[in-house]
């Protein structure tokens, strides 16, 4: 039973790390990466759909993305959606859409660093909340006399070690992202 709680907490913490990576993908580093446009929604026959469902997004060079719509009629809508996104990008439209990424200024780098730190802090909070939930479940098992106090103490220590491991991983990934951001 305790092992199930440990496995469950590890899986939930792993999902938090995956979510952190998705959050980091939205932070521009100055290099072109298709995931920068993941959050862009395009109007398509009356409903908004993710850009990657109406076009291929690729990297042309280190500072340019290329968006190739599946239908030529979508070029204007995709162009407009990219311009209106909060990414600060100005696409160049022809048969396909080229999206040059502006060079990051020092101020922009600092802003992106703040966003990355915020994402990391949110991940740490989520991990700690998972720990709190699992420790609550363990205490409930103790109250129901399903486990002994020694088992509760050991399980609590194990959960803390798992939590520390994942918090350290978040810090490691944040440090890597910050280093990537500050690289000119």
Curated annotation (Swiss-Prot):
Top-level taxon of origin: Bacteria
Main location: cytoplasm
MF annotations from Gene Ontology: ribosomal large subunit binding
Gene3D superfamilies: 3.30.1360.40, Ribosome-recycling factor (1.10.132.20)
Subcellular localization, as worded in the UniProt entry: Cytoplasm
Pfam families with a match to the protein in the record: RRF (PF01765)
SUPFAM superfamilies: Ribosome recycling factor, RRF
GO CC aspect terms: cytosol
GO biological process: cytoplasmic translational termination
Key words, A-Z: Cytoplasm, Protein biosynthesis
Biological role: Responsible for the release of ribosomes from messenger RNA at the termination of protein biosynthesis. May increase the efficiency of translation by recycling ribosomes from one round of translation to another.
Similarity comment: Belongs to the RRF family.
Protein name: Ribosome-recycling factor
Provenance organism: Acinetobacter baumannii (strain SDF)
């Amino acid at each position: 039973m305790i092992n199930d709680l440990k496995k469950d907490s590890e899986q939930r913490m792993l999902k938090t790390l995956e979510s952190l990576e998705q959050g980091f993908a939205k932070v521009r580093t100055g290099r072109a990466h298709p995931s920068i446009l993941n959050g862009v929604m395009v109007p398509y026959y009356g409903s908004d759909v993710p850009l990657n469902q109406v076009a291929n997004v690729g990297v042309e060079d280190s500072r340019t993305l290329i968006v190739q719509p599946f239908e030529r009629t979508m070029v204007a809508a995709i162009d407009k959606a990219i311009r209106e996104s909060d990414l600060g990008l100005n696409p160049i439209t022809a048969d396909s859409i080229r999206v040059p990424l502006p060079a990051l200024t020092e101020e922009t780098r600092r802003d992106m660093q703040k966003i990355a730190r915020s994402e990391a802090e949110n991940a740490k909070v989520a991990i700690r909340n998972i720990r709190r939930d699992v420790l609550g479940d363990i205490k409930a098992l103790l109250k129901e006399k399903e486990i002994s106090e020694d088992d509760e103490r050991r399980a609590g220590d194990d959960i803390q070690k798992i939590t520390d491991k994942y918090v350290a991983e978040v810090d490691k990934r944040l440090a890597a992202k910050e280093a990537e951001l500050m690289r000119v």
